[in-house]
C-alpha cells in the first residue's frame, strides 16, 4: 500500500496582489505525474485545500480538474478540511466527488473507512479526521476559566482521536491492514512559519504528540514546513507544496511517499516539489541591498524573482521605495515587499517607548505609525495626503 501525504495547498492565495495559479497548476500536474510514476494507491490532502472559505473560480477549477484527471489513474483521493476551508464549500461537491473516487471530509463525525488499493482490494483503515472545530466536539460550559477551557478542549480532541482509533481497530478486525489517521492542528514542538494562523486562539496552543493514538501513520496538516514530531517517524507534517510566506522561501518543499507492508509502516520518502516561482529575501542597508541585487545582473530569468527587501538601517529612508525601484527596474526581479527588518522595528519601538506624546508633534506620531506598516509608496503617499488634508481641515475649523 502506497500513499502520498500532502497538505496546505491554499489554492486561490493572493500573495501581495500576486496570483499563485501558475505555481499551483504546475504542482498539481507534478502530483498527478508522481502518483502515476510511483503507482500510488491513495493521495491524502490533510487540510487547507483552499486559502479562503470563498475561493476564486480559478481555484475551484484547479481542484475540480485535478480530481477528474486523477480519477483516470485509479488512485483514490481523500480531501480533509483545514481551518481555512469552508465546510459548505467542500460539501457542495462532495456527492459528485464520491463518483470520482474521491472522499471529502469537511467536518467531524466521519467514521473510519477502508482505503482501497488501485485494484480495489483493502489497503488500509483510515481515520479521516479534519480540522476539529471546538463547537463540533465540545459542549460549551459556563464558568470555566482559561486553563479549564484549555483542558476541556484538549481532552475532547484526545477522546475524539482515541475513539476513532478504537473504531478503526474494530473495522480492521483480523485483516493485516495499517491504520492511518489524519489531523489539521498544531502539535507541541512544531516549527511554524509566518503564514500559519493560530487555530484554537485563547484555548489551546498545541496538541501533545503523545496524546495521539498508536496508529501506523499520522498524516498532519496546518504547519507549512515538513517535519517529524516528537522524534516519532510515523507522526509527520508534509508542509505546503509552495512557499506561502517569504520566510518559507529557500526551503525545500515536499510530498511524503508513504509505503506500508504487511500491515505496518515500511518507509517514508520525501519527494521534492519542483520550484516554479523563484523567491528571495534580501536584508541589509541600501549599499548591501544594491550589492545583493547584482546577482541578477545580465541574467535571463523567467518568471522574475519575487523579492522581499528588509532594510536594517537606523533611518528608514523616506524615499526608499523609489530608490529600490530605480535599482531593480532593469533586473529580472519584482519587488513585492519593502519593510524594516523585524529586529529594526523592535529597536525603534523600544526607543520610542521612552518618549512621551508631549515630546512629539502630531506629524511625528503619524509618520512613526505609518513606518510600521508594510505599504508601497503609492499607499504611503495617499495616506500622507489624507492625513495632511485632515490636519488642514481641523486647523481651519479651529481658526473659524
Curated annotation (Swiss-Prot):
One Gene Ontology term from the biological process aspect of the record: DNA repair
Superkingdom per UniProt: Bacteria
Classification via InterPro entries: Calcineurin-like_PHP_ApaH, DNA_Repair-Maintenance_Comp, Metallo-depent_PP-like, Mre11_N, SbcD, SbcD_C
Keyword Hydrolase: yes
A GO term, aspect molecular function: 3'-5' exonuclease activity
GO cellular component, one term: DNA repair complex
Keywords assigned by UniProt, alphabetized: DNA recombination, DNA replication, Endonuclease, Exonuclease, Hydrolase, Nuclease
Gene3D superfamilies (alphabetical): 3.30.160.720, 3.60.21.10
Disulfide bonds: none
Family in the record: Belongs to the SbcD family.
SUBUNIT field: Heterodimer of SbcC and SbcD.
PANTHER family: COMPONENT OF ATP-DEPENDENT DSDNA EXONUCLEASE (PTHR30337), NUCLEASE SBCCD SUBUNIT D (PTHR30337:SF0)
Role this protein plays: SbcCD cleaves DNA hairpin structures. These structures can inhibit DNA replication and are intermediates in certain DNA recombination reactions. The complex acts as a 3'->5' double strand exonuclease that can open hairpins. It also has a 5' single-strand endonuclease activity.
Protein name: Nuclease SbcCD subunit D
Gene giving rise to this polypeptide: sbcD
Amino acid at each position: 500500500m502506497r500513499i502520498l501525504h500532502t497538505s496546505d495547498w491554499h489554492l486561490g492565495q493572493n500573495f501581495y496582489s500576486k496570483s499563485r495559479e501558475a505555481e499551483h497548476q504546475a504542482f498539481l500536474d507534478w502530483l498527478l505525474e508522481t502518483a502515476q510514476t510511483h503507482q500510488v494507491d491513495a493521495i491524502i490532502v490533510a487540510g487547507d485545500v483552499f486559502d479562503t472559505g470563498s475561493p476564486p473560480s480559478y481555484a475551484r477549477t484547479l481542484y475540480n480538474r485535478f480530481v477528474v484527471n486523477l480519477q483516470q489513474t485509479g488512485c483514490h483521493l481523500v480531501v480533509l478540511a483545514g481551518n481555512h476551508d469552508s465546510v459548505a464549500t467542500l460539501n457542495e461537491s462532495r456527492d459528485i466527488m464520491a463518483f470520482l473516487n474521491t472522499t471529502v471530509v469537511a467536518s467531524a463525525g466521519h467514521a473510519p473507512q477502508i482505503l482501497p488499493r488501485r485494484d480495489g482490494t483493502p489497503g488500509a483503515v483510515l481515520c479521516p479526521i479534519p480540522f476539529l472545530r471546538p463547537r463540533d466536539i465540545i459542549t460549551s460550559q459556563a464558568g470555566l476559566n482559561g486553563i479549564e477551557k484549555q483542558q476541556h478542549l484538549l481532552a475532547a480532541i484526545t477522546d475524539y482521536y482515541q475513539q476513532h482509533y478504537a473504531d478503526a481497530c474494530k473495522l480492521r478486525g483480523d485483516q493485516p491492514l495499517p491504520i492511518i489517521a489524519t489531523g489539521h492542528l498544531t502539535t507541541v514542538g512544531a516549527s511554524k512559519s509566518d503564514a500559519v494562523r493560530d487555530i484554537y486562539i485563547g484555548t489551546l496552543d498545541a496538541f501533545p504528540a503523545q496524546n495521539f493514538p498508536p496508529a501506523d501513520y499520522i498524516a498532519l496538516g496546518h504547519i507549512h514546513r515538513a517535519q517529524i514530531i516528537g522524534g516519532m517517524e510515523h507522526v509527520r507534517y508534509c508542509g505546503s507544496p509552495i512557499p506561502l510566506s517569504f520566510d518559507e522561501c529557500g526551503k525545500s518543499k515536499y510530498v511524503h511517499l508513504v509505503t506500508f507492508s504487511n500491515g505496518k509502516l515500511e518507509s517514508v520518502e520525501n519527494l521534492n516539489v519542483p520550484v516554479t516561482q523563484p523567491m528571495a529575501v534580501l536584508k541589509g542597508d541600501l549599499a548591501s541591498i544594491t550589492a545583493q541585487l547584482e546577482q541578477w545582473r545580465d541574467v535571463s530569468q523567467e518568471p522574475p524573482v519575487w523579492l522581499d527587501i528588509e532594510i536594517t538601517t537606523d533611518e528608514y529612508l523616506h524615499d526608499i521605495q523609489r530608490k529600490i525601484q530605480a535599482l531593480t527596474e532593469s533586473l529580472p526581479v519584482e519587488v513585492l515587499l519593502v519593510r524594516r527588518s523585524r529586529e529594526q522595528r523592535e529597536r525603534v519601538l523600544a526607543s520610542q517607548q521612552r518618549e512621551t506624546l508631549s515630546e512629539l508633534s502630531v506629524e511625528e506620531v503619524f509618520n512613526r505609525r505609518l513606518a510600521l506598516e508594510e505599504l508601497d509608496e503609492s499607499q504611503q503617499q495617499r495616506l500622507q495626503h489624507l492625513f495632511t488634508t485632515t490636519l488642514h481641515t481641523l486647523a481651519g475649523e479651529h481658526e473659524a
